[in-house]
């Protein structure tokens, strides 16, 4: 594949993912807007806390999408049609097992969440109501991890984009109807999410049987349960799960340390982190492209194209990070004012503008290497680099720097965490990615 053609392939895979990612905060904004016009501010808190529960829970299971993408892309590169199909079958089996686990443990999860979360009795009561309804979307959400991972591995990110847009549009419409027209409050928002997720799952199934039917093969138990394939599948996904848990815990640790600095500083940090997430929406698009292409060329045993893909991904990553850095550096107050109109927030955030500007160039390498490692199914390496970065760098740096430098110390520790992730994956790439297969 020529360089120009490879660039087109990267953009063809990246752009739909970026569009999909951009629709995510829109949904959250609409939910907050609907709750913000109810007769109590407790509704807003309930949506925020309820969303946190599901974000943590589903982030732990996000390994299913990553593992499915890597295995499927490698089978695609090797032109192994049977293994392409069985990558989906095995992932759906894991999704069903995870569904049984989540639904069986919903009582203990709700109890533990209510104990750990801080809020008034009214907020926690609404949060519990929201949780009890939205939990029934779990089967659809977990199966969609499998389907979206499979479609990306099959070098198609347009279908996941369509699924994401349709799901979010249906969710927004139903939430407006249930809340404004039917007066269902948080129950309406949660119910809209449940129905929308099943609409997304139905769409994924329709695409499977209309666009990819010729890739499907009859399910044979002996192949589905093949010992060596199953062992590798579980081993890789277990390592990806550990990595996901460590990442979720790292973000939660940052948030918890922010809360120790007081409500005002917590608000400042949560606003600044929104711009970390916004940048990640763009770089994750290229990371997903990396998953698909790196997996494909790994499966095809084509080291030349593999190296060229990684090189081009990082060029794109740099050219995405550069304008974000300039914009964050030149217009920090304007960006912050988009999120909050509280008069004290903008001046309080000014000492931390430097960290906002530093986010893009410091973090893009870690995001892109994630995609490369996932495509190569270098799960053990990505687990180890996350362990080194989270436990060996972020935790001690925070404990060392925060007592002396306060919020500056926390942000320095967080950026060191991201540097450690990017640097450790760079150092391990020769063995983990380029010489792995």
Could you describe each region identified by the protein language model?
Residues 1-14, 72-139, 181-241, 294-359, ...:
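Short alpha-helical transmembrane segments in multi-pass integral membrane proteins
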């Amino acid at each position: 594949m020529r360089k120009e053609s490879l660039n087109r392939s990267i953009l063809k895979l990246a752009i739909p993912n970026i569009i999909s990612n951009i629709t995510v905060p829109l949904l959250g904004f609409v939910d907050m807007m609907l709750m913000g016009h109810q007769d109590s501010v407790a509704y807003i808190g309930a949506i925020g806390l309820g969303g946190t529960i599901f974000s943590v829970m589903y982030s732990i299971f996000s390994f299913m999408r990553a593992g499915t993408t890597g295995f499927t892309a490698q089978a695609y590169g090797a032109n192994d049609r049977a293994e392409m199909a069985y990558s989906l079958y095995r992932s759906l089996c894991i999704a069903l097992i995870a569904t049984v686990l989540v639904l069986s443990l919903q009582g203990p999860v709700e109890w533990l969440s209510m104990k750990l979360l801080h809020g008034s009795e009214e907020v926690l009561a609404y949060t519990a109501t929201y949780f009890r309804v939205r939990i029934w979307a779990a089967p659809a959400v977990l199966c969609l991890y499998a389907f979206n991972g499979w479609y990306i591995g099959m070098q198609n990110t347009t279908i996941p984009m369509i699924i994401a847009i349709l799901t979010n549009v249906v969710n927004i419409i139903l939430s407006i109807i249930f809340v404004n027209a039917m007066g269902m409050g948080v129950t309406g928002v949660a119910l809209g999410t449940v129905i929308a997720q099943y609409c997304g799952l139905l769409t994924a199934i329709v695409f499977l049987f209309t666009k990819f039917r010729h890739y499907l093969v009859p399910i044979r138990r002996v192949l589905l349960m093949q010992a060596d394939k199953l062992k590798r599948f579980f081993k890789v996904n277990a390592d990806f799960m550990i990595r996901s848990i460590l990442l979720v815990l790292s973000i939660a640790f940052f948030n918890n340390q922010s809360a120790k600095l007081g409500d005002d500083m917590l608000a400042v940090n949560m606003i600044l982190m929104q711009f970390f997430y916004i940048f990640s929406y763009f770089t994750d698009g290229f990371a997903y492209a990396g998953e698909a292409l790196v997996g494909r060329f790994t499966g095809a045993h084509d080291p030349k194209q593999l190296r060229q893909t990684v090189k081009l991904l990082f060029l794109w990553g740099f050219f995405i990070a550069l304008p974000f850095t300039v914009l964050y550096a030149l217009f920090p107050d304007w960006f912050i004012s988009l999120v909050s109109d509280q008069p004290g927030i903008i001046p309080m955030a000014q000492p931390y503008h430097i960290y906002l500007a530093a986010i893009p160039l410091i973090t893009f390498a870690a995001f892109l290497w994630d995609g490369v490692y996932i495509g190569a199914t270098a799960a053990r390496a990505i687990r180890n680099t996350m362990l080194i970065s989270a436990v060996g760098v972020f935790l001690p740096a925070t404990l060392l720097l925060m007592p002396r430098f306060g919020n500056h110390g926390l942000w320095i520790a967080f950026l060191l965490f991201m540097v450690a992730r990017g640097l450790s994956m760079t150092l391990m790439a020769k063995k983990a990615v380029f010489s792995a297969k």
